[in-house]
Every structure is written in C-alpha cells, then in structure tokens.
C-alpha cells in the first residue's frame, strides 16, 4: 500500500550554545593585548526563533529525514554525528548513528553524542529533548519548510549555522532557478483537478496546508480537497468520486505501487483511473520538505502537462 509508512511522519506536524567563558580581567595591565571575541552566529528558524551559536556547528543531530537532506544540501553533512530512524538520504546518511525515532528521540542518547546543535521538526515531539538540551546549553533549530520557496531559504540558513555558506549559497540558488523555471513554464496552463492520495485503505488525502499542494499550484494543479479543515483528512470513496478529479497523485515506494493504485481506483470506478491518469512519485521525495521535493515537482508538472495534451 502506498504511503502507509510515510504518512505518520509526513503529517504529524501540522537554545543557544554557551559563549566563551568570561575570564577575570581584574589583574590585566594596560600592556595586555586585547583579544577580539568572534561574532556570534545567528539564524532564524521556522518557528521564528533566533538561534545563536558561538561558533559554527560541528556536532549536529537531526531529528527528521528532511532535515538531514537539508544539511547535506548545505554542504555540512560531515558535521552530523547522529540522526533518527528513516533518515536515509543521501546514502552517506545511512552510516550515521541512530538515536531513536522522530516522535520520541532519546535525550540520553542524544546527549551522549555531545552535540552543539539539534535540528528538530515537530515542537511537540522535540519538547522533552529541547528541555534537556537547554540545560546543557545546546541550541535547537526547528526546521519545517511550508512552501517550495522555503526549501532553498532553509539551505542558506543552515549554511550560516555550519559556516558552509560557500556551498549552501550556490545550492540554494540552483534550487530557486529550477523553481523559477517551473513557474515560468507552467504559468497560465489549464488547471488540472488532482486528488492527492496519502493513503488508500482507508483513504487519506492532504489539504492546502501541505507542501505537496504548493507543488501542485506551481504545476497548475488544483487539490480537490484543498479546503479540508485538517491537513490529512480521511475521506470516503463517495467524496472522492463526487470531487471528479482529473488525476490521482500518490507517493510510492516502487513503480509497482503505481500500477496497484491504478488497478484499485479503476475497480472503485474513478473516471480518472479509467483514463489512466494515476501518477506515482517517490514518496520520500514528494512528502519530505527537502531538496528532492524540487525533483518531485518537476516530475509532477511533466505528468500533469501530459494529461493536458489532446
């Protein structure tokens, strides 16, 4: 079944490091040369908090797969010392020590890594750990990009925290250029009504608050359940049929999942499926708010544009 494993982690969402010790200067004479204190490093996280470091992060822990991908995109993968289960991209991330899962990170195991920066996602899940890190003087940065445009911004901010601006800046600009190209290419195209399949048994979807809907908008797609009151509502088959989507979009783990989805929707009588308009995109790329979502958006735009062809 597609997206069953990805759904909980993808939609559940909806501290400063100590500075240099102050030395006793009372015995200093006028001849003692002054030592310039390095300027603190600042970056605003996705909760609007100012995160401050005394020096670039060199022992960071990520608590979400997308955060790991963002760190690597910022050129700072070498400075990760641990992550969570499921944080598997890029391949180098699979060699990192695992300190639990994203919903219940183990504070003791995290503290044992001697981190100087925690990159978290869900405040509710990270709160107990954040309290421990606060006592230890370890900064916590919350990463939760809500739009495609926020992804390159996140890469740049992480570059600041790690001191890898020389790598992060060009990476962010490349992502922006690709997004700008999509916006220019698909602006004004005929709208395509899309059902976002976040689960099939039972049926779940995503509303406008999801970053997937932002990708749809970029491609000229219209989320047929965009106005749902919650981010990931369960919906009935009758509601999907009544919405009359032109296409179905689902995150998949393997190409065979798309064929199974197509067969399932055909059996349920969805006209879009009868026309073959059921599309699958790698679930991790589609649902993680990281750099690979730009890849997913490019594929999505191309899929929807083929549907527009006579």
Model-predicted segments: where are they?
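Bacterial Sec-exported substrate-binding components of ABC uptake systems
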Residues: 2-66, 164-196, 247, 302-310
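A short, structured surface patch at a secondary-structure boundary
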Residues: 58-113, 117-122, 224
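Short helices/loops that flank or line small-molecule/ion binding pockets
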Residues: 107-114, 136, 235-244
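A ligand-binding cleft/hinge motif common to bilobed small-molecule-binding domains
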Residues: 124-135, 247-264
């Amino acid at each position: 079944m597609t997206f069953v494993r990805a759904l909980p982690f993808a939609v559940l969402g909806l501290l400063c490091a100590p500075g240099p010790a102050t030395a006793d200067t009372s015995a200093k004479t006028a001849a003692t040369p002054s030592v310039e204190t390095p300027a603190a490093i600042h970056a605003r996280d996705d909760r609007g908090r100012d995160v401050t470091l005394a020096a670039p992060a060199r022992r960071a822990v990520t608590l979400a797969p997308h955060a790991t991908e963002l760190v690597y995109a910022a050129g700072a993968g070498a400075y990760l010392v641990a992550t969570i289960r499921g944080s598997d991209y890029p391949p180098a991330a699979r060699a990192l020590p695992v300190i639990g899962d994203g919903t219940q990170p183990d504070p003791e195991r995290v503290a044992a890594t001697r981190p100087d920066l925690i990159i978290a996602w869900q405040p509710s899940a990270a709160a107990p750990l954040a309290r421990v890190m606060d006592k230890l003087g370890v900064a916590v940065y919350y990463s939760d990009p809500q739009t495609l445009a926020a992804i390159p911004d996140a890469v740049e901010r992480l570059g600041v925290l790690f001191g890898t601006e020389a790598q992060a800046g060009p990476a962010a600009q490349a992502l922006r250029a690709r997004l700008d190209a999509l916006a220019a290419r698909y602006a004004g195209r005929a709208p395509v009504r899309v059902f976002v399949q976040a689960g099939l048994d039972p049926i779940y979807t995503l509303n406008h608050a999801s970053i997937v809907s932002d990708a749809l908008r970029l491609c000229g797609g219209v989320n047929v359940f965009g106005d749902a009151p919650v981010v990931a509502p369960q919906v009935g088959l009758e509601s999907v049929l009544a919405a009359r989507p032109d296409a179905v979009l689902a995150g998949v783990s393997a190409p065979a999942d798309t064929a199974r989805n197509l067969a399932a929707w055909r059996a349920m009588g969805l006209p879009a499926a009868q026309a073959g308009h059921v599309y699958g995109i790698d679930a991790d790329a589609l649902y993680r708010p990281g750099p690979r979502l730009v890849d997913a958006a490019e594929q999505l735009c191309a899929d929807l544009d083929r549907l527009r062809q006579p």
